Amino acid sequence: MELKLSNEKGEAAGQLEVSDQAFDAPFRESLVHQVVTAHLAGARAGTKAQKTRSEVAGGGKKPWRQKGTGNARAGTIRSPLWRGGGQTFAAKPRDFSQKVNRKMYRGALRSILSELARQDRLVVVKQLTVDAPKTRELKARLEGLGVREGLIVVDEIDANLELAARNLPRLGVVDAAGVDPASLVGAERVVITESAIRRVEEWLS
C-alpha cells in the first residue's frame, strides 16, 4: 500500500510504498486490548505493603482483663478494629506483569498502525528536525503538518528535538525501537519519519 509523504513544511512530497503486512492489517480489537492491558500492567510498581495484626509492633499485653470492666473484650491493641492496629487483609508486594509473546505483540502493533493509517492519523514526513531546542520552532513545524498533540516517532532521538518537545503538553517523542502499543493507542496523531517507518516495517514484516 501507499502512504502520503510530506516534507517538514507539510507540503506533499509524493507517496511512500509500505508493506501491506505491516500497514494494511485488519484491526483486532481483542488482541490490541490484551496487549495494551499487559503493557500498562507491566508498568505498575506493585510495591504496596501493609502490616497484618501479627506484624505491627507491640500489642503483646492484654489491654484489660476479660471480664468486669464493662468494656468489650480485647486481647491486643493491634487488632484491626483498633486505631493503629494491623490491616485485616494486608496488601503485599506483587508482580502485575502479564505474559505476551512476540507474535501477539507484533500483531497488535500491526493492527494499531494499520488503523491509524486508515483513519489518516498517521503522518509520514521525510524528516523532522529542529535547529535549536526551541519549543516555538517545533510547534510551528507540527502545526504545518496539522498536528497539535500526539506522538513523534524518529529513527534516532535528536537532543534538540527531545528538548523542544518536552514543554509541549500531550506530545511524546520516541525512537523506532521504543514504539509501544499503549503510546500509539493513546496518541491523537502519530508523526513518523521515513527512516523510522522503514525500521518499524522491517521489524513487523
From Swiss-Prot:
GO biological process, any: translation
Leader sequence residues: none
Residue ranges the record marks as coiled coil: none
Residue segments, region Disordered: 43-78
Zinc-finger is among the record's keywords: no
Disulfide bonds: none
Similarity comment: Belongs to the universal ribosomal protein uL4 family.
Keywords from the UniProt entry: Ribonucleoprotein, Ribosomal protein, RNA-binding, rRNA-binding
InterPro entries hit by this protein: Ribosomal_uL4, Ribosomal_uL4-like, Ribosomal_uL4_dom_sf
Signal listed as a keyword: no
GO terms, molecular function: rRNA binding; structural constituent of ribosome
GO CC annotation: ribonucleoprotein complex; ribosome
Function statement: One of the primary rRNA binding proteins, this protein initially binds near the 5'-end of the 23S rRNA. It is important during the early stages of 50S assembly. It makes multiple contacts with different domains of the 23S rRNA in the assembled 50S subunit and ribosome. Forms part of the polypeptide exit tunnel.
Protein's UniProt name: Large ribosomal subunit protein uL4
One Pfam family in the UniProt entry: Ribosomal_L4
Organism: Halorhodospira halophila (strain DSM 244 / SL1) (Ectothiorhodospira halophila (strain DSM 244 / SL1))
Assembly description: Part of the 50S ribosomal subunit.
